[in-house]
């Protein structure tokens, strides 16, 4: 609306300056020519048409001035294709226990959006039965201070730590999983035959939709986050002789 306002003001000023002023600061002549009014009206109509017909941006969010406080249209979060079970917008830190309730992002008291089942999230997963062990040990946490990330094109982008929705500040959390130790045992991964295999644990990644900024415009982008810990195997070279 700010661009439309400035456009209308500019058109109005051009229309005024097009007519000469007398010393008494009164427009000279009896009336403004009809052709001039027609041209001015046409300019206003064109500006209004462009404002209404302009394609909607990916999301209705802009940076106000030089601040980092970004206001987001709550309808944005109703697009299910943008949801990810590893991304959460919340006004408070999410619980990390196995009996945690589902975390929803509610706007205006209406039906919740960004609904995902996170009750299974825990920092010590998975749960094994007696005698069972994980090849690699992993740890999972909700990350709330992510400021930069690598997008799907390999470029570094700025991640929005928080957004303003209906005058409420929501933090953007990422549920990340990584290896606790690259070598849970001296030989590498647990349970691997070290006589024939070299092994080590490594963190793997996936891409999730997250709110980022570029040129003072907020937008959804795929960014890379840590999501699992796996064991990498290399066969040992056979000894000759």
From Swiss-Prot:
| Cross-referenced SMART domains | NGF (SM00140)
Please give the chief subcellular localization of this protein: secreted
S-S bridge residues: 136-201, 179-229, 189-231
Q: Name one GO molecular function term.
A: nerve growth factor receptor binding
Recorded hits in SUPFAM superfamilies, A to Z, give: Cystine-knot cytokines (SSF57501)
The keyword Calcium belongs to this UniProt entry's keyword annotation? no
Q: Give residue ranges for the propeptide.
A: 19-121
State the oligomer form and interacting partners: Homodimer. The homodimer interacts with a single NTRK1 chain. The homodimer interacts with a single NGFR chain. The NGF dimer interacts with a single SORCS2 chain (via extracellular domain). The NGF precursor (proNGF) binds to a receptor complex formed by SORT1 and NGFR, which leads to NGF endocytosis. Both mature NGF and the immature NGF precursor (proNGF) interact with SORCS2 and with the heterodimer formed by SORCS2 and NGFR (via extracellular domains). The NGF precursor (proNGF) has much higher affinity for SORCS2 than mature NGF.
Q: Which named protein is this? A: Beta-nerve growth factor
């Amino acid at each position: 609306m700010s661009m439309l306002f400035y456009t209308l003001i500019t058109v109005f000023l051009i229309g005024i300056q097009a007519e000469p002023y007398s010393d008494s600061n009164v427009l000279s002549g009896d009336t403004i020519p009809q052709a001039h009014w027609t041209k001015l009206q046409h300019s206003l109509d064109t500006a209004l048409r462009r404002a209404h017909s302009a394609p909607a941006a990916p999301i209705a969010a802009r940076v106000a001035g030089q601040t980092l406080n970004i206001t987001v249209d709550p309808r944005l979060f109703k697009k299910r294709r943008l949801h990810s079970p590893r991304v959460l917008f919340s006004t408070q830190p999410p619980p990390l226990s196995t009996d945690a309730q589902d975390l929803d992002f509610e706007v205006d008291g209406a039906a919740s959006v960004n609904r995902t089942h996170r009750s299974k999230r825990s920092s010590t997963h998975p749960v094994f039965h007696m005698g069972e062990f994980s090849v690699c040990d992993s740890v999972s946490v909700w990350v709330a201070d992510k400021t930069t990330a690598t997008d799907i094109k390999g470029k570094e982008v700025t991640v929005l730590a928080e957004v303003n929705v209906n005058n409420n500040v929501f933090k953007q959390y990422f549920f990340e999983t990584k290896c606790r130790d690259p070598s849970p045992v001296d030989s590498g991964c647990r349970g691997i035959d070290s006589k024939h295999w070299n092994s080590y644990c490594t963190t793997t990644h996936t891409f999730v939709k997250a709110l980022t900024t570029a040129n003072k415009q907020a937008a959804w982008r795929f960014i890379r986050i840590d999501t699992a810990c796996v064991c990498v195997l290399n066969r040992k070279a056979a000894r000759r002789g």
